[in-house]
Amino acid sequence: MIYLDNAATTKPKPEVVSAVMKCLTETWGNPSSLHRMGQDAKAIVGDARKAVADLIGAKPNEIIFTSGACESNSLAICGLLNKDSYTLITTNIEHKSIMNIADDWFILHKIDVDKNGFIDIIRLEQALQITKYNTPLVSIQYANNEIGTIQDMKRIIEMVHKYGGILHTDATQIIPDRKIDVSGIDMMSFSGQKLGAPKGIGVLYVREGIELSPIIYGSQEKSRRGGTENVPYIAGLGEAVRHIEYPIGEVRDYFVQQVLAQIPDCYLVGATGKDRLKNNASVCFKGISSEMMVVMLDQKGICVSSGSACNAGMEVSHVLKAISMGDDAKSVVRFTFGDNTKAEADVVVEELVKICKKMRENS
């Protein structure tokens, strides 16, 4: 099997599996308990918290463990909206966990993006300027999970803070891609499952001084996120960030070159160069159903996606609609690389050539 859907989830690393199993079989105490077993579990949580903080240049007390990026996003946004008067400003290509909150919120501005998925900075400033009576709460994805476009976060930070706003970013896709620092960012979400950690563990960074209303009540995580800590998965996340390896993009680049050279009427969707995630290749095969292509590749043991795993289905992705792709939006396939080889890329390209030829001949 050739797995090219790493933007959806990643295979747990061996070190992660070992850490999880050790907690399940040896250090399975409740970290709130005062006895030795509980304190050993508490130490594991503390070590993982420090590892995560070190990864992004934060303080350990600024890290909240959650069940994943969706919960982290919800806590960041709802935790402020439920507490004080804010106007939510976001974009039209955000993750569904942000989009769904935005759809339910009355005081809202959605910023358009261009054909490559970049936010319109002028529109952002205009939205900030007309937010007179409430504090602006801006939520902008650091890098898009479908088309791989990376936003100019430095400019966004400067703009948001110029108008006294609070900035949240969903960094789920950028964290595995390159080293980033939270300087200037007020809140940041990400998920363990994109880093080789288990599904069901996530992080919310909250800058010291920002107070959130919990959406899950309880005494854990300094009363910011209730529920007994998921010690095994927290331990796994700690190992994942300690062993993180950033991609260089060589196999992805090779794959894109071969696809564009061997298959007519196709093109790369989204940004290029340094402004794109190094593992992402979203390709439009004009006139070909992306859903059919995903199924046909799966029959050959190749795992890809027709978009975000949170959006995948018959309806065209809101991200592809937002970048004005028209009918081409129905023909986009996302390939996201992990530790794949050029030999595997060649196999995938060979199958793509066959599928495109067959489907176009039969259309």
Regions found by a protein language model. Name each.
Residues 1-363:
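Pyridoxal 5′-phosphate
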